[in-house]
Amino acid sequence: MSMPTIRAVRALTVRGGGADYHDQDAGHWIDDHIATPMSRYPEYRQSRQSFGINVLGTLVIEIEASDGTVGFAVTTGGEIGAFIVERHLARFIEGQRVTDIEKMWDQMFYATLYYGRKGVVLNAISGVDLALWDLLGKVRQEPVHQLLGGKVRDELEFYATGARPDLAKEMGFIGGKLPLHHGPAEGDAGLRRNLDALADMRSRVGDDFWLMLDCWMSLDVPYATRLAHGAHALGLKWIEECLPPDDYWGYAKLRRDVPRGMLVTTGEHEATRWGFRMLLEMECCDIIQPDVGWCGGLTELMRISALADARGVLVIPHGSSVYSYHFVATRHNSPFAEFLMMAPQADRVVPMFDPLLLDEPVPVGGRMKVPDTAGFGVRLNPDVRMQRPYEH
């Protein structure tokens, strides 16, 4: 079988529900009073959208092969990401064989090194990489998890991230991760409110249900340490992404100082094997949480996972729906997965990328079998309005 070559790359943008999951209507739990790095400023404390968390929007990347097969993926990046894909990255993709994913990744990364390395450039590279894996799966008529070496488990088990872990327990999830609401700028009163909220949720879910706190880069080491010790009596399983991603020294100190048995996790906003190498070599955390749509795509996530596995560190990818599910199913050091509760009140299970994707699987009773359909097994919704702001 001769492999087709890549004929065209297209970068599209979408507003509203999609890969930029923060781009939600008013009243959604994800835009509530949640601690962020901007919470130090009172005017940006009540709503995360007030400081522009949803400004990028969704980036959709389509890659068309010479036989007419189209692979696609979605990530965060919007118009900025579309410009990077169309005006810079496309030259490294078009004309290549669909199997040459390693070469294409390498050229995209090193060609953007002088202005990239992390952030929206890596989002764009990640999106292209995921679209290439989707395309290869469709050309070969195999699911992506088969391309990665095959499943090591038949079923995935999930914890839920959202405002209502008590409801997540009723739905069959193994645990619930709460957003932290108050940061250091709100003082001791805010710290007490954080612990009171955790205590209230513990009383609702009982002693045997996992509870975790998502701190979204909003704390400093002293505050995070106090929070961890206060939460220990309430059975907190882990404390997540307390510090800015580049504060490896702070994470290393925090991990030494938290109560024995409490896990420190981070990596959602880290990228590439080199960033995660720092986290691992400096012993910053117990679990790394790369986002496959931001860290460099599946090609890079496999390298990151191998580094972690050699050190006995778990890899629990951040959200990402099907793009992480296919990966988690193939790795022993990813024993469970995250599900983002995207219903406005976190009171029901809805697809993470709804309405952008069709056929997107969701957990039932906190569990899911990863589909065996070709590629990632999802389709773009033709009723969602997309724009192509740039061409090449």
Curated annotation (Swiss-Prot):
Cofactor(s) needed: Mg(2+)
Catalytic residues in the record: H318 (proton acceptor)
Residues that coordinate or bind Mg(2+): D214, E240, E268
Binding positions for substrate per the UniProt entry: H22, R48, E338
UniProt key word Lyase: yes
Reactions accelerated catalytically: L-rhamnonate = 2-dehydro-3-deoxy-L-rhamnonate + H2O
Enzyme class per UniProt: lyase
Keyword Magnesium included in the entry's annotation: yes
Cofactor: record remark: Binds 1 Mg(2+) ion per subunit.
Functional description taken from the UniProt entry: Catalyzes the dehydration of L-rhamnonate to 2-keto-3-deoxy-L-rhamnonate (KDR).
HAMAP family: Rhamnon_dehydrat (MF_01288)
Oligomeric and partner information: Homooctamer; tetramer of dimers.
Family according to the record: Belongs to the mandelate racemase/muconate lactonizing enzyme family. RhamD subfamily.
Protein name: L-rhamnonate dehydratase
Organism classification: Bacteria, Pseudomonadati, Pseudomonadota, Betaproteobacteria, Burkholderiales
Name of the encoding gene: rhmD
